Amino acid sequence: PSRIKVASKEPVATLVAKYSDIDINGHVNSIRYIEHILDLFPIEMYKEKRIRRFEMAYVAESYYGDELTLFMDDAGEGVYDVEVKKNGSEVVCRSKVIFTEK
């Protein structure tokens, strides 16, 4: 996962970390990042394909009220690289999602 690189400078989604995103330690729960990333893809994608592999590299923590911006590169052949930044600059996590035919 550390080799995941995202070149895109255009955000595909922006959201603010809410109460339901926060774990008992006051951080955004790691599962919520995965859910936000999976929400980037249209429902049709899930009807036609399945996720073969999902890699995640956590880099930093984020907290209630942080603005999370998601960037995505389509690497081709069903491979997507995603990066989440908080408050416009610091990378929180990177992910590689690989889809395959059902």
Q: Model-derived features: where do they sit?
A:
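Well-ordered beta-strand positions in beta-sheet-rich domains
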Residues: 12-14, 53, 94-96
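A conserved acidic, glycine/proline-rich C-terminal tail/linker
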Residues: 44-81
